[in-house]
Regions:
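Catalytic-core signal marking the mid-to-C-terminal active-site face
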Residues: 319-349
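FAD-binding core of FAD-dependent oxidoreductases
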Residues: 121-136, 172-180, 188, 193-202, ...
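Short, glycine-/Ser/Thr-/acidic-enriched flexible segments
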Residues: 80, 89-90, 214, 334, ...
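Short loop segments at secondary-structure junctions
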Residues: 87-88, 141-144, 180-182, 211-214
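Detector for conserved single-position "signature" residues within domains
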Residues: 310, 315
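Contiguous, small/hydrophobic- and glycine-enriched helical/loop subdomains that border
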Residues: 132-179
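N-terminal lobe of the biotin/lipoate ligase/transferase fold
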Residues: 2-149, 377-385, 392-399
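Long, positively charged amphipathic alpha-helical accessory segments at protein N-termini or as interdomain linkers
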Residues: 61, 153-167, 185-307, 340-399
Length: 399
């Protein structure tokens, strides 16, 4: 989501027609028993955790363990993070250098939101930013009744009930808000992603409510490496975005209300916490999502080139060095690396030593290129540029 604008603020109705009692947090055992019990056809869960890796692991557990004929609603809010699609390229989709600045020197860029985590989800779709001003919703149901608009429209109705009548689902299955007399007119407030298995289907999305970081979203989701990368992965579709100006709790209650209107009484309505991490399947999923092999190593094949070539004839930005660089990578590992220039900066045999290097484990491209035989003066120019473009300060292993 890109190109943020000012928030749309307004009064929020305080009362919702159906009253749901206050809920206490259930234990790990209670959660796993309730989720998997065959009699629990309609289930609703809200997470108190802000850990994106945990919440996505809970979501995956619900997808795998809930009864095949059940319908499940899961609501959660994450700490600041960028969540990108199963088949996306983080070097293409994310300004990794900016994330390094947020983590290592936030004052230099005026950032006060804490570290922004990078998360690869298990479903498809594009890259999105989450923070405390977003609520995420997931609906899991039988594939036979899956519809890309059905539950997006449920969320749009919830927003309408809270005084946002100009919300609707567009042709891309996104939830948008129309603002009369605004020069842009229509803003995206919610994007969705999907995962279908033989027995279950998942539709999940996020809704921009009161994000304090709206003006930073564009800078995080626009990679400086984009002009140089051609990928087989999925590209994000950028849209103007804005807040809708609703409190998280009111939004959650309204979505639960609409879910109840669609499916009737709940068999389960519970709150979960970090305790569910003690569940074996959730713990294993949590470890996988946090692993560098998952975040970076699942990247589809791509080519990085500083110059146009037959398969990617785009013009490149002007550089302050004349060396032509190109490498191919599979699963984040260099498959072939070439460097050409007037000074013959490195031999083919030397550059072949870069093959099998994991891009995300490189701490200094200058050092790598020097070791491969590139002249020190050339490597001193090319290396820092590559470090910057590829976000080495963020991707390299932390000490």
């Amino acid at each position: 989501m890109m190109r943020p604008n000012r928030s749309f603020l307004g009064s929020t109705p305080r009362n919702i027609s159906r009253h749901f009692p206050s809920l206490s947090t259930i234990s790990r055992r209670q959660f796993t028993d309730a989720a998997s019990h065959s009699s629990n056809k309609i289930q609703v869960y809200t997470s108190t955790s802000r850990d994106p890796f945990l919440n996505l692991s809970v979501e995956h557990h619900l997808l795998q363990k809930t009864p095949p004929e059940s319908t499940v609603l899961f609501l959660y809010t994450n700490d600041p993070c960028i969540v990108f699609g199963r088949n996306q390229n983080p070097w293409m989709e994310v300004n990794l250098r900016r994330l390094a600045q947020f983590r290592n020197d936030p004052a230099s860029v005026g950032w006060t939101g804490g570290p922004v985590q990078l998360v690869r989800r298990r479903s498809g779709g594009g890259a999105v930013f989450h923070d405390e001003g977003n609520v995420n919703f997931s609906v899991i149901c039988p594939p036979a009744v899956f519809d890309r608009n059905k539950h997006a429209e449920m969320v749009a109705r919830a927003l309408s009930s809270l005084g946002r009548p100009n919300t609707r689902v567009n042709e891309r299955h996104d939830i948008v808000i129309d603002i009369p007399d605004d020069p842009i007119g229509t803003y995206k407030i919610s994007g969705s992603a999907y995962k279908l298995t033989r027995l279950r289907s998942l539709h999940h999305g996020t809704c921009l409510l009161r994000s304090p970081n709206l003006t930073n979203i564009s800078g995080m989701l626009r990679s400086p490496a984009e002009p140089y990368i051609k990928t087989r992965g999925v590209d994000s579709v950028r849209s103007p975005v804005r807040n809708v100006g609703i409190e998280n709790a009111a939004f959650e209650a309204a979505v639960v209300e609409q879910f109840a209107s669609m499916y009737g009484n709940f068999d389960v309505r519970e709150v979960i916490s970090d305790k569910v991490l003690e569940t074996d399947s959730i713990s294993k999923g949590y470890e996988e999502l946090q692993s560098r092999d998952w975040i970076y190593g699942q990247t589809p094949k791509f080519t990085f080139s500083t110059f146009p070539y037959e398969e990617d004839p785009r013009e490149r930005p002007q550089l302050d060095f004349d060396t032509k660089l190109r490498f191919e990578a599979r699963h984040g590992v260099v498959d072939k690396f070439t460097a050409e220039g007037p000074s013959s900066p490195a031999s083919e045999d030397g550059l072949s030593a870069l093959t099998s290097s994991s891009i995300y484990n490189v701490s200094s491209w200058g050092a790598q290129l020097s070791q491969a035989g590139m002249a020190d003066g050339v490597a001193a120019k090319v290396g820092p540029w590559m470090d910057n473009i590829l976000g080495v300060d963020f991707t390299k292993p932390q000490q």
